[in-house]
Structure formats: C-alpha cells, structure tokens
C-alpha cells in the first residue's frame, strides 16, 4: 500500500508560529532537580536553572481526546497533518546563549521552518523541521533546531 503525501498542502505550515508562556518558579526548579535525583536545594530568583530544564517549559495544554495515536498532540494544528503512521525524533542542534533563571517568564516560540519528503529504504519519509526559541524579555536564551521524521 502506498501513502500519498501532498507536499504543497503540507508546506502551507512553513512559518507557522506557536507561543506558550511559562514561569520558572523555585518549585519548578526543585521538581526538575528531584526528577534527576538531585538535591532539591533552595533555589532563589535569579539563580540559573539546572541544565536541561528548558525541556519542561512551554508545553501546550492538550486534552486527552485531542491527542493523536502516538500520544502527542494531534497533527494538523502546529505540526502539519502528515499522513504517515510513525513519528520519530531525528535529533536537535541546541545553542544555549544565556542561562534561564529562576523567576524568569519564558516564552517558548515554536516555528515550522521546513518540510521535505524523501524516499528511504523502508518507504516514504517526511522531515518536518521545527525551531524553538526560549525567550526572556524578548531575547532568545536557547535556540533549538529539531527535525522530526514521519515515516511509513
């Protein structure tokens, strides 16, 4: 069975932006440290957060019945509705320009940067590249370029 992908339709998602605001409170930092089995300490406003905490920030609230079969938000809102059954993370390039700090109001700005369809050994592949900027006071502190591979 061959799946058809309308690349012209999918490319309409290029440039789509989604902004989610989050707040780094001391308890957010402590919960992250506890997750990593670290001493939770007593973080104060202005302290740099533990490396990797940005992965916990800026997630959209999605009701259970709005999830796709892979438990991610259903395709077609931010990410295009690629008609392939598997979604895989294909890696990231991360640039930390400045640390996020406890007390920061962080805006995670997500942008669909590119969409490409390719033929692989196992069939059709669609690469959706999203870029994520974590903004504090309109300055990008962390930039992530992340291709996601959807495949048959």
Name every feature range the model reports, one short phrase each:
Residues 142-152:
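Single conserved hydrophobic/aromatic residue that forms the stacking wall/gate
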Residues 87-137:
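Hydrophobic beta-sheet segments that form the core/acyl-binding groove
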Residues 2-105:
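Hydrophobic, proline/glycine-rich low-complexity stretches
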């Amino acid at each position: 069975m061959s799946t058809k992908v309308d690349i012209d339709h999918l490319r309409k998602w290029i440039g789509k932006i989604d902004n989610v605001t989050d707040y780094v409170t001391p308890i957010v930092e402590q919960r992250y440290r506890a997750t990593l089995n670290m001493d939770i300490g007593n973080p104060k406003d202005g302290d740099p957060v533990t490396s990797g905490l940005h992965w916990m920030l800026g997630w959209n609230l999605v009701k259970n019945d709005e999830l796709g079969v892979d438990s991610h938000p259903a395709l077609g809102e931010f990410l295009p509705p690629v008609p392939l059954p598997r979604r895989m993370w294909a890696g990231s390039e991360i640039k930390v320009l400045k640390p996020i700090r406890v007390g920061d109001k962080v805006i995670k700005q997500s942008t669909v940067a590119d969409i490409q369809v390719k033929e692989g050994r196992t069939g059709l592949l669609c690469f959706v590249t999203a870029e994520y900027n974590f903004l504090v006071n309109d300055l990008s502190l962390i930039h992530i370029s992340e291709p996601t591979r959807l495949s048959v």
